[in-house]
């Protein structure tokens, strides 16, 4: 089982249709050419939800793939309506992590437990998405950055 995670800015500022095409192409390539079957998603912004819906849509053609929501905080009602896009939720051991750092820690967990990263990250040094991308680069992870 090979795993891919996603990291991206909360707001998509580029042409959404181009991002959708690149995202779907990247996911299909990982499934067909790299045997990726598991996808981790943080569920925290436009890009994460686009990834969730895309993986969910691709399950029709690839019923063996799975999608998992990796929580940075204990679940709230906000997630209840959106869980149908995921097979499971995962809450890594982060109870002692201050809330300010929970998303960073969650992103690191997803990267540490994945072989591939599909990113939508621009050069915004102070963003969590950029920090996740930098962390993945330091781990020599295979990265597909679909930002325009």
What is each PLM-predicted segment?
Residues 1-148:
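Acidic/glycine-enriched connector segments
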